[in-house]
């Protein structure tokens, strides 16, 4: 049986960075990817805006992935492409993975695992769209794959449900390719995507955005013929009498992303109900010792640069992993936060500057965020504005916090003085 220090599952941006981090820390590393090429979703992202933080340049997704692939080739990590992980079992102080690839079935042993499995898109059935099941109802990522990788046009007259970033980007992309985009319809009262994408993808191209609207029904036999849209109330329930029918041949869905964590759940990794990803500590180790997580499998990120940051940190931590007892301090947040990651601090690991990511639950003006350790204020930071679609990053020095097992770290939001 082949033995590795670290096995990484998923060869997208997080997995590439994790493999690089593990190899730089001296670990014998295997990166497992189910597709024929590394890069994950970046392979179909031909728009720019990637790499401003990591490389100080504005790159396309393909260029960003290529840079990491080239770095990976030079560091000596092994890769297994077109390979699925069908099973992971705990074995002694490590793990045994069953891999299915072109050469058949094989097993490998790992001292530590990094799960970088990314996320998947919600479908029409997950957001309760009723009606028939014609062709032409597809997720924004699928539409992007058709256009950017296959050179096929999936729509001529379409509408987009949901204002997530990929939906906004595809509204622009479809328009550039000659499709008529009737509008972007969002059930929430505010958009779900980044402000810059609202501006660059919709406003610059004259594409209307309808908030507090949703699709209630799709109609068509073999191909989509029309959709029914309606206004929604504060609880996002359709308002009777506001329905209208729109003729179109395609409905593009951008209604949210869900971290892929079937393997994590099979290993008994506890998940956070808010992020839908695993609970983890400051080294990205989950509550199952030796299992690390990073990227969109942990929580859905806005920027690939942050995905790579978590990947490199998780890979390096996995390379250093030695089975030992943990002393966990819990991280909690008041009602103003949607979530905070990481959710635990292992007090047996060296304390120092720790990066936290969070999203607010609702849009806020000038806001002060304070961090308390057992009731004592450690630090505070003032934000001019907070929006749920825009993830925030906060670095806190925990070296003088005096944390111990059972300590409690609390994030608090309060209105800042004007």
Q: Positions of the model-derived regions?
A:
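A conserved FAD-binding loop/helix module that cradles the flavin
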Residues: 294-335
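FAD-site-proximal beta/loop scaffold in flavoenzymes
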Residues: 115, 137-147, 250-301
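Hydrophobic alpha-helical scaffolding
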Residues: 55-58, 62, 188, 241, ...
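Rossmann-like nucleotide/phosphate-binding core characteristic of flavoprotein oxidoreductases
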Residues: 1-5, 81, 319-418
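Beta1-alpha1 glycine-rich phosphate/pyrophosphate-binding loop at the start
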Residues: 4-67, 71, 145, 154-200, ...
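FAD-binding core/adjacent interface of flavoenzyme oxidoreductases
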Residues: 1-9, 66-157, 233-241, 252, ...
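Predominantly flavin-linked oxidoreductase catalytic cores and closely associated redox partners
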Residues: 106, 112-209, 214-223, 297-302
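A Rossmann-like FAD-binding core segment of flavoenzymes
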Residues: 72-99, 175-262, 352-385
